[in-house]
């Protein structure tokens, strides 16, 4: 009888210990998605520094970004932007200038990993210029500030005309600039413009503008082009079309200049 009671007591104690240990063991941590934790904006809290070659016969230029601190959002995305950019020539410890006249106050924190601060030959004169992305969005539309390098003064000069171009693509082979703005409806509402450089300014030579009339349920596409010997743009196409399918538009947003001469 005694042995039976002892055996039962040991069984109960063993069950109690096992149950207590299991209760104290931490539950497995659910897997987390690292993609959700990744910020979508560049963290400029500590500033930034860029080095560019402007021309083969010039020393390297350094651009030092002073940050404008802002609190991150609830998802951890940095909202710090630019307060000032100092420019250094070669090994000089003294800045030769600051990049002026851009409205830094309205700047958005740039996309993480983007080429938001870059040197490109915007006016095709053999000298790289400076582009800084100021605004951007999910539609792909962009707005930046541009400073053209002036070889006479050896300084970077703000260009209002180039800064108003929006999202742009340079074509050094044809020395043209193509811009594109997205108005919605899967990109079928858009405006695309091609520019040449005259008197150090972008001059439009072709525009393709497409909209959608919700009353008529039709797309409206207008193409304007500058003719030889003329300065003004003239309308070469003005068409309406009902979409045969979803977002089936008369002008192709992916290649708006395809059917236009001197592409």
Task: For each feature predicted by the language model, list its residue ranges.
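Short glycine/acidic-enriched loop and turn motifs that connect beta-strands
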Residues: 136-139, 184-186
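Blade-edge motifs of beta-propeller repeat domains
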Residues: 83-110, 153-169, 176-178, 206
């Amino acid at each position: 009888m005694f042995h039976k009671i002892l055996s039962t007591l040991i069984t109960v104690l063993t069950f109690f210990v096992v149950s207590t240990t299991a209760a104290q063991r931490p539950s497995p941590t659910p897997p987390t998605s690292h993609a959700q934790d990744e910020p979508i904006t560049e963290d400029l809290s500590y500033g930034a520094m860029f080095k560019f070659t402007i021309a083969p016969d010039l020393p390297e230029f350094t651009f030092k970004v002073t940050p404008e601190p802002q609190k991150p959002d609830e998802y951890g995305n940095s909202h710090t932007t630019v307060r000032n950019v100092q420019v250094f020539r070669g090994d000089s410890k003294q800045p030769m200038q600051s990049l002026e006249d851009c409205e830094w106050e309205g700047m958005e924190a740039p996309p993480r990993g983007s080429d938001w601060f870059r040197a490109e030959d915007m006016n095709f004169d053999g000298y790289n210029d400076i582009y800084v992305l100021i605004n951007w969005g999910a539609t792909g539309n962009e707005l930046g500030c541009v400073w053209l390098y002036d070889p006479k003064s050896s300084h970077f000069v703000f260009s209002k005309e180039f800064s108003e171009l929006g999202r742009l693509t340079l074509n050094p082979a044809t020395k043209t600039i193509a811009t594109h703005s997205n108005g919605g409806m899967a990109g079928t509402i858009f405006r695309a413009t091609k520019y040449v450089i005259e008197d150090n300014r972008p001059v439009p030579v072709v525009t393709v503008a497409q909209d959608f009339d919700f009353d008529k349920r039709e797309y409206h596409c207008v193409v304007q082009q500058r003719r030889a010997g003329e300065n003004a743009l003239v309308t070469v196409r003005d068409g309406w079309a009902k979409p045969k399918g979803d977002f089936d538009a008369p002008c192709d947003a992916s290649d708006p200049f395809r059917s236009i001469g001197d592409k």
